[in-house]
């Protein structure tokens, strides 16, 4: 039921609301440890993540995003500032099937250094070292070009206008 309703939410199908309202809690204080919490916005998710990391007794490492070119807030696939440490629960934001994880795979940080984190993903045998990921920000525009016979043809041109680099 949960996955079916989550998929409905992803495509904007409001029929999932009854399910989530019936299975929601008004206070996180009563949630079991390591519960996955669906959030209405990034601000709430960032707050929960910060609380969980702050509660861990391990040295913290801060990762600050690198931005080049034209990058809007909606283009940022990860927070500009991420603080992690050993024991932090994380979820991948990228696909790397050769490394054994995809977008949404959850795991636990086993080590964090200035340039990477090492994660033991749930259900995996090996730990994975994850470095910063570079997302390209593309801008597309419709253009009219002439074909070889001089007739106008509509095309879409896409260009990289910026990059956003952060731990995924």
Q: Where are the predicted features?
A:
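Conserved helicase motor core of P-loop NTPases
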Residues: 1-99, 108-110
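Conserved nucleotide-binding/hydrolysis modules and their immediate coupling elements
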Residues: 72-168
């Amino acid at each position: 039921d949960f996955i079916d309703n989550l998929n409905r939410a992803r495509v904007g199908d409001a029929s999932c609301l009854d399910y989530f309202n019936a299975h929601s809690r008004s206070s996180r204080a009563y949630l079991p440890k390591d519960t996955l919490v669906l959030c209405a916005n990034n601000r709430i998710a960032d707050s929960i993540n910060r609380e969980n990391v702050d509660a861990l007794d391990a040295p913290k490492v801060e990762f600050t995003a690198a931005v080049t070119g034209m990058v809007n807030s909606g283009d940022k696939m990860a927070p500009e500032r991420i603080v992690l440490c050993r024991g932090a629960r994380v979820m991948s934001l990228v696909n790397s099937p050769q490394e054994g994880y995809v977008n949404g795979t959850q795991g636990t940080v086993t080590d964090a250094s200035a340039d990477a984190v090492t994660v033991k993903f749930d259900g995996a045998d090996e730990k994975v070292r994850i470095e910063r990921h570079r997302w390209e920000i593309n801008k597309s525009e419709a253009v009219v070009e002439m074909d070889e016979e001089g007739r106008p043809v509509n095309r879409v041109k896409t260009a990289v206008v910026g990059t956003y680099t952060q731990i995924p």
